[in-house]
Amino acid sequence: MVNHNAETAKTGNGTNATANLIVKADGNATQPKAMTSSAARMNDALSASLADLSEQENGTTAEDIHLNDLYTRYRQRLRKSLFRSGLLTSLLACVVSIIIGIVYGQHLVQTMLLVLAALISGSILTALQFPAVLSSPAAALAFAIVTTFSLGTIAAITGDELAPLPMYALFLCIHSMLPISWPVSVVLALFMTAIHIVYRIGTSPDYAPNLPMLFGEIVMLASASVSGLYYRIMSDAAHNRTVDGTRTGIEQRVKLECEREQQEQLLLSVIPAYIAAEVKRSIMLKMADACQRAGGQASTSATRFHELHVQRHTNVTILFADIVNFTPLSSSLTASDLVKTLNDLFGRFDQIAQENQCLRIKILGDCYYCVSGLPISRPQHATNCVNMGLQMIDAIRHVREATGINVDMRIGIHTGNVLCGVLGLRKWQFDVWSDDVTLANHMESGGVAGRVHITKQTLDFLGDKFEVEQGEGGNRDAYLADHKVESYLIVPPKPAYTYSVPRVVECIEQNDPSPTTEETKEIKETDQSHEATDVADVLLPVTVAPPPAIVDEKMSPTSINSQEAPLHAPLASAASMSIKELSEEEDEADEATAVTEPLMHRDQDGKNDKEPKANGGHRGSGDSAASESVAKSAALSLPADDLLSMSGSESGISNSGAQAQSSNPASVTPTAAAPAGGAASNSLTVAEAPERSRRKLSVQGLMSFADRRRSSGAFIEGRKLSIHSGESFRSHAGHVTRNRPSSKMTKYVECWGADRPFANIAESKLVKNIGLASIAMIESNLLPPERKCFNFNFFGPPTELKPFTMWYRNTPREAMYRAQPDTHFRFDLICAFVLFLSLAVVQLIVIELNLALLGSLLASFVSLALFLYLSNMSVPDVHASTTERNGPGQVVASSRYLRLAMFVVVNILISSCAVFSVINYTVPDGVSKEPSSNQTILESNFSSVFVNSTLEDVQLWEIDYAIPIAPVFLYCCAISLAAISAFLRSGFILKLIAMLVAVIAQVTVLGYSDLFEMYNDANITHGLPLEIKGFLLLLVIILVLHTLDRQGEYVARTDFLWKAKLKVEQEEVETMRGINKILLENILPAHVATHFLHLERSTELYHESYSCVAVMFASIPNYKEFYDETDVNKQGLECLRLLNEIICDFDKLLLKPKFSGIEKIKTIASTYMCASGLRPGKEDGATDEKRTEEHNVVILVEFAIALMSILDSINRESFQRFRLRIGLNHGPVIAGVIGAQKPQYDIWSNTVNVASRMDSCGVMGRLQTTENTAKILMTAGYECECRGLTYVKGKGNLVTYFVKTPFDGKL
């Protein structure tokens, strides 16, 4: 079984590579110093993954083996405890017998035999204190045989006329207490029966035993076997049900827990943990209030406003980043390529953010913004953001250089205070608000492409860590000029020592085979004979790993961009870059697309609008630490088969260049860089294969690729890296296959290996090995602990069960336990009926027929048969509904009081039958009870005596004749006690009381009978009377039966307790699961959340294409005039509270069945974005597309009018004058989820961009739409007013329409 905290990977030669890979429980991975080869890490991870899969395949067999072993050990442990109890009982009985024998002058031989029996019991009991004694079946069988034969023989010899009574107790022990199988117990019982028969024959005069008495004793011992086997069968069945039921419950519990954990991970991937905890607390309070209202109690938390989950944080730094010229690129990508490119690109930014302790907030179009200092205050928040900005610029620079696409980053940073949290009731997205956020947004707008633009406040926190120059942001942004913001530009740190090698690196899909050595050589020869002329085949710099001393050195996040940064800095580090940055800086004034701007994020005039084209991605928190550790401590080491002789220039690849030093596998001799316009002469040549296998190279962004794929679960099949073997750059016969720039962009960013959304939701080992996990939990919670004698903790945990009564300390739980239906009560009645028949057979064989005997047996038989018929008339079904539980058997099984009444009646009848016929042997008054006075009668012929004697003489003769059968009544008493114990679920205390009452009453009746009085006078000259001796032996039987009853009660109660705890825990998990489901549906569409919760699909990128979707943006432009940060409104918190009320009321409309087809996408400050027509799953290709198109548009217009009505109502209540400005459009869209740290569901397309522009260039109080959408609305009966040609930013002049609503012209 794989350890949850560590995995041992297999090396190539089959030996264990200890410390090769350590995976911590929280997902973080650390790399040992001895393991710096990335290729070896990939091989090790692949081996470990295959080992996991192999173990999972073998899990079923191992699970069955473990379960069978657990069940065997469970029964053996219980049987072992019973064995100890039986030995203790025999030891106690022998000690009491020895004491009585000494007091009454018992024969020395019998006393010595009893001493021997006590020694045997004590010795075996002592030996059992060692756990290894009964570890083997042979040892258990040996102890069982020794115990049985020794105690049985001694009981037969010392028992005299009552020998069957101790034998009865022994038979019960053989079948129910000895640690042997039931066939062995049956064989032992037969042997002991044979020994008893031989002993009876041997001790009889002239070897002629009283055959009726002998047959009666045999039947009695057979009834003991019936009783013992019944207890064993039922207890084994109960144990089996306990193990199976507990296992099922635990498996369900584990599955629910794992599902809840996945939902929790999914939830925490979107919103911070403290926000999620606060929201859960609010939901639980609402659930509690709902329960109180349902119970008729008054609500305790009535409030007029919705819960506001927003907090204020001071001293944080906000970073806004915009990708320059990304819109033309995204418009040329397919749906899958767009989602993949966005996920990889913004996923890389998320990785950089996490490495620099920044929290990404949201992605708006190609605008990416994050904050450092949330939710945990960090002193280095300003430094973190600047470092992140520099690394983002470096990352996008390599995209530009590798693909030839002119993209860049413009970054603005400001330090101040923020309000952060979530607004509304549905589709939460963590966001920040404040005037400082607005300023940071304008710092980006007024920034310079390829530079980090900061304010004076940020510079004050930076100190002298970075060199700056005047930013003059006011010349590029009016907001900065109006507020007289002093800005600066960070001077990029100088590159450290790097060696640029012209390379093109591509990622091959996981199912593509890796190139063989021959293929690699062929590719190398082809590349050496041709020159690449495509401008896109640019040079990809390769950083050579430093010596091991530098590799092992740890870096701080702030040292990445310093001039002294180590050579092995990651891709985004400025220290690893050596190619000259392109100097072109694009002006964004004519950027093609934009969306409605967020309050305090974008200007409302549309100048700096950003469209919602992309949402970022980030790896899980646990995985990022692993990636960061690998990126800072190791370089990528390619396998020998993949290493090529590397050198080249701008025009192609050649084998000329400086030879690598063979003395140091990590060293490379660089050559001088060629002048601009000439061929670059930097080269790196790899020597022989053994030498190449030790060569360490660092390809940007790829050295943590393996660890990220392994941690995200996508590394199972292995992802191959190939140089010059990709689909786009494979050379054939002197031709070079070229891709579009957008395709190259997709291929390049894919090599970064950014995690898929929700990649942290990986199948845990608890789910993989759920059977073994449940068995382990059963073993730790259900298997009784090993105990020593007199350790009463075995009889129940003191915290849950009372030590002697074993009743639950929790009264309601005790009531629940007693109210359980007993579906096996009918089997108890059957066993009691069989024991009654045994009692009747004994009496009919031994006792002469008389009216009292026949009457008692017949009455009891009829009553028991009636009870048996009623309880078996219809099979009880506890799963049936209440109305279906009308059969007699179901009523009996369900009614505890009815079962109790039947228990009392049955046992009174059986106990009475055991002694009732003794009344037939009563000496008439005035007649002497001395047997000697009637000697002549006894010696004469019965017929002549009957003729010549009086009636009194005849009765006295009958009594004298029946004197030898007196012990039979005690045998019948033993059978009646077993019948009482046969009712397994009636409570061991109740049965103990019933047995004691019955035996006392029976012995009292027998003791006062003339038969026993005459027997004592005739056969006992010294010692205890027969009834007293029988009473003591019956007490031994009671003690044995009580031990069995107590054990059965203990097992039943612990099973019920464990299941009750499981049920409570399961309900708690169900509650949290329900809460998480509510939260998930408030964040992602239900079908999207279901998609990512399926483990086999959790690593896939989710995207859907729709041909006709209506998109709407509804903003409140004059809300920014209302927002103000003063002490009166708690620095803007109360302003956000009103906005939260507005959005919550908007969200409530989505709960109406009429608007169930509308999906809220997100809110951007005071802008509400939603869409209609996003059906779950792939588009179903509706036959009536025109009708579907019309429905999507019309329902969204009705929703817009409902929004206007809601806002108008809020205005009247809050004395405000808010107005909606709505933009509407319809057409094809792409829906998908991107990002790993905080995945976002979003939609992209020109349809979305135009809908956003319809809002931003619209008029307050009006609903503006495009011409095509207006035509559909007019066909549906809506009146539209043509606005004419309207300038739309990025689209030129478009004909737009206003849809008339009841709120047009309303102030």
Curated annotation (Swiss-Prot):
Enzyme Commission number: 4.6.1.1
Cofactor note: Binds 2 magnesium ions per subunit. Is also active with manganese (in vitro).
Gene behind the chain: Ac76E
Domain named Guanylate cyclase: residues: 317-444, 1110-1255
Topology of the protein relative to the lipid bilayer: Multi-pass membrane protein
Native source organism of the sequence: Drosophila melanogaster (Fruit fly)
Residues annotated to bind Mg(2+) 2: D322, I323, D366
Record-level GO cellular component terms: plasma membrane
One Gene Ontology biological process: instar larval or pupal development
Compartments it resides in: Membrane; Cell membrane
Family matches, as PANTHER family: ADENYLATE CYCLASE TYPE 1 (PTHR45627), ADENYLATE CYCLASE TYPE 2 (PTHR45627:SF12)
Keyword terms, alphabetized: ATP-binding, cAMP biosynthesis, Cell membrane, Glycoprotein, Lyase, Magnesium, Manganese, Membrane, Metal-binding, Nucleotide-binding, Phosphoprotein, Repeat, Transmembrane, Transmembrane helix
Protein name according to UniProt: Adenylate cyclase type 2
Purpose of the protein: Catalyzes the formation of the signaling molecule cAMP in response to G-protein signaling.
Glycosylation sites: N934, N941, N948, N1019
Biased composition (Low complexity): 624-633, 647-683
